[in-house]
């Protein structure tokens, strides 16, 4: 009775900490496998060896032929399959129990810290404990979220369950096939020749074999479906976690690419300026103007000639003082007229 209570608690733990597909798989495992196998397996396969007869009186021939026909009993083979398939789930359940015990220790330590008087140290220690609790992914009602290391454990258990299911299906096909033949031809020592052996209730056993085959295929399908579900869930969680690190305005919209002109952009390094574009032509002719220094030399030579003509006695090299002395109005007007004429003639020569 105590063993059944322990098994019931174990099943409750597995049911509580599994996905929806995992719960369906567990129901298929225990209802359609263990229950059916326990109730009908014994009645169908109870006379498996006693009713296996061969048409020979050679001692030991029937036993060796039975051993060759059935290396392992179907019922024992299915029990072994159940043990292998359920073992990864037990490992996952052990991880869940470990996390639950760890959370209980953290809660106990937190309650002990709250009883202390030093508030600062207590708050720091409680903050550290809360961070550790968050890493355990345990909710307030005691259920564990399948995240982090627990997700990898659950994913590994589903992978191994799928491998075991497929392996046992291949093993059953290799050992027995999926149809129970009524006559088995045996040729083995110590049988003197080929011996015909007869199986009891072959049709009933064939139906039972096909039923267990369908249950195994359903279990394998659920495992593969749950594996795809977990992989998609992990990818979505990783994408959401990655999108949190990308800034929202990393890629601005087209209308936000170029900011509007405001007073704040007056000191920007690049400002909009208006330019006048002149048409360019290869045959453009520009007027010939003298440079300012050439014009100054012309004016200087003209004034020098006027000074020489006005005062022949004092050359240019000896009138340094008289050149800066005040001139009478009459003389000034004469010089001005002469300079005007000279400049006009020079201008005419220039433009000619």
From Swiss-Prot:
Residues 332-352 are annotated as: Disordered. Residues 2-23, 100-153, 232-352 are cytoplasmic. One of its GO terms (biological process) is cell-cell signaling. Its main location: membrane. One of its GO terms (cellular component) is connexin complex. GO terms for molecular function: gap junction channel activity. Coiled coil: none annotated. Keywords: Cell junction, Cell membrane, Gap junction, Membrane, Transmembrane, Transmembrane helix. InterPro entries: Connexin, Connexin_C, Connexin_CCC, Connexin_CS, Connexin_N, Connexin_N_sf. It comes from the Eukaryota. Expressed in ovarian somatic cells, heart, leg muscle, liver and eye but not in brain. Residues 47-76, 177-208 are extracellular. The chain crosses the membrane at residues 24-46, 77-99, 154-176, 209-231. Residues 340-352 have a biased composition (Low complexity). The keyword Metal-binding does not apply. It is a multi-pass membrane protein. It is found in: Cell membrane; Cell junction, Gap junction. One gap junction consists of a cluster of closely packed pairs of transmembrane channels, the connexons, through which materials of low MW diffuse from one cell to a neighboring cell. A connexon is composed of a hexamer of connexins. Belongs to the connexin family. Alpha-type (group II) subfamily. This is Gap junction alpha-4 protein. It comes from Xenopus laevis. The gene is gja4.
């Amino acid at each position: 009775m105590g063993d059944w209570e322990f098994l019931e608690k174990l099943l409750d733990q597995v049911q509580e900490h599994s996905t929806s597909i995992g719960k369906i798989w567990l129901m298929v495992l225990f209802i359609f496998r263990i229950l059916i196998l326990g109730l009908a397996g014994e009645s169908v396969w109870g006379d498996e060896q006693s009713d296996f007869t061969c048409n020979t009186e050679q001692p030991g021939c029937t036993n060796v032929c039975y051993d060759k026909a059935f290396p392992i009993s179907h019922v024992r083979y299915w029990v072994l399959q159940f043990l292998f398939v359920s073992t990864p789930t037990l490992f996952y359940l052990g991880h869940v129990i470990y996390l639950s015990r760890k959370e209980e220790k953290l809660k106990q330590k937190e309650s002990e810290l709250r009883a202390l008087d030093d508030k600062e140290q207590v708050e720091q220690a409680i903050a550290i404990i809360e961070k550790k609790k968050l890493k355990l992914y345990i909710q307030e009602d005691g259920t564990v979220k399948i995240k982090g290391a627990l997700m990898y454990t659950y994913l590994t258990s589903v992978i191994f369950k799928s491998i075991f299911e497929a392996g046992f299906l291949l093993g059953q096909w290799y050992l027995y096939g999926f149809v129970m033949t009524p006559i088995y031809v045996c040729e083995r020592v110590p049988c003197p020749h080929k011996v015909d052996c007869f199986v009891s209730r072959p049709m009933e056993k064939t139906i039972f074999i096909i039923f267990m085959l369908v249950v195994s295929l359903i279990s394998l399908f659920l495992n593969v479906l749950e594996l795809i579900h977990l992989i998609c869930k992990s990818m979505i969680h990783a994408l959401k976690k990655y999108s949190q690190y990308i800034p929202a305005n990393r890629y601005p919209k087209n209308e936000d690419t170029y900011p509007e002109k405001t007073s704040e952009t007056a000191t920007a390094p690049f400002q909009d300026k208006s330019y006048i574009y002149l048409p360019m032509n290869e045959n453009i002719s520009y007027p010939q103007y003298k440079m300012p220094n050439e014009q100054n030399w012309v004016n200087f030579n003209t004034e020098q000639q006027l000074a020489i003509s006005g005062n022949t006695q004092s050359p240019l090299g000896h009138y340094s003082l008289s050149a800066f002395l005040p001139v009478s109005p009459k003389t000034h007007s004469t010089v001005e007229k002469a300079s005007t004429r000279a400049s006009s003639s020079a201008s005419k020569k220039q433009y000619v």
